[in-house]
């Protein structure tokens, strides 16, 4: 179910503080965060946010098309290694 319009988008407070600090200091380093549940806001456009995927921080460069989505959508947590090849196909 979608989030109510009257509530507005959810963003962790500590992430907003980090984004404001980077915007004022004009720093180019990625912002490291574990908050995959935060919604991408228009203020994030042009920033690089390192989102944790459970093992490492994946750098995500935020573009205008990402606004409204969650940060976790852009840092995949599962790696697909492929299905086992059949023995008949190898012959």
UniProtKB/Swiss-Prot annotation:
Transmembrane segments: none annotated. Belongs to the universal ribosomal protein uS19 family. It comes from the Bacteria. One of its GO terms (biological process) is translation. It comes from Aromatoleum aromaticum (strain DSM 19018 / LMG 30748 / EbN1). Keywords: Ribonucleoprotein, Ribosomal protein, RNA-binding, rRNA-binding. Protein S19 forms a complex with S13 that binds strongly to the 16S ribosomal RNA. HAMAP family: Ribosomal_uS19 (MF_00531). GO terms for cellular component: cytoplasm; small ribosomal subunit. GO terms for molecular function: rRNA binding; structural constituent of ribosome. It holds the Pfam family Ribosomal_S19. This is Small ribosomal subunit protein uS19. The lineage of its organism: Bacteria, Pseudomonadati, Pseudomonadota, Betaproteobacteria, Rhodocyclales. The keyword Lipid metabolism does not apply. The keyword Ribosomal protein applies.
